[in-house]
Amino acid sequence: DVYKRQGGYITGSNVLCDFIRSFSSGFIFTTALPPAVAAGALSSVKHLKTSQIERDNQKVKVTYLRSKLDSMGIPHLMNPSHIVPVMIKDSIKCKQISDILLNDYSIYVQPINYPTVPKGTERLRFTPSPLHTYDDIDYLVNSLASLWKQCALSRVVA
């Protein structure tokens, strides 16, 4: 028997798993959230209805990340979002960089590859939070800069 509390698991070919990850409606399964998790989420929503501090801090961190990426010549898509897509433009290198960031630098980021994005637009999608420190962001950007050179990726010329 399998005992589960929350989450799910899929098996299949790489193509099938990639399709499900890319096009399923958010990995929604029938498992309900535990009451403590639901209560915590409700408390967070109530707090954020009255507080602008977290949003302002996140905007500051996003601006800082973009500035540091620019200073290192690491290409990223400009958008009004809190999501900072760092452009790799190569599916194999995108996965390799994601793996190296996790294994060697303890930084988790999901590679975004085809079919989620068109071929040739592969990217790493970063979302700085209000709780990330400037040191965290510096560590990320310095790690990326090292890998950028190691993987022979092109830089943006200022």
Predicted regions and their residues:
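Short, small-residue-biased leader/transition segments that mark boundaries at the very start
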Residues: 1-3
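Conserved core segment of the aminotransferase class I/II
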Residues: 7-55
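Hydrophobic side chains in well-ordered alpha-helices
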Residues: 19-20, 97, 136, 140
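Thr-Gly-centered strand-to-loop micro-motif
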Residues: 5-7, 31, 86, 111-113, ...
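Conserved PLP-binding catalytic core of the aspartate aminotransferase-like
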Residues: 55-66, 70-106, 114-116, 121, ...
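Short, glycine-/Ser/Thr-/acidic-enriched flexible segments
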Residues: 13-17, 91, 131-133
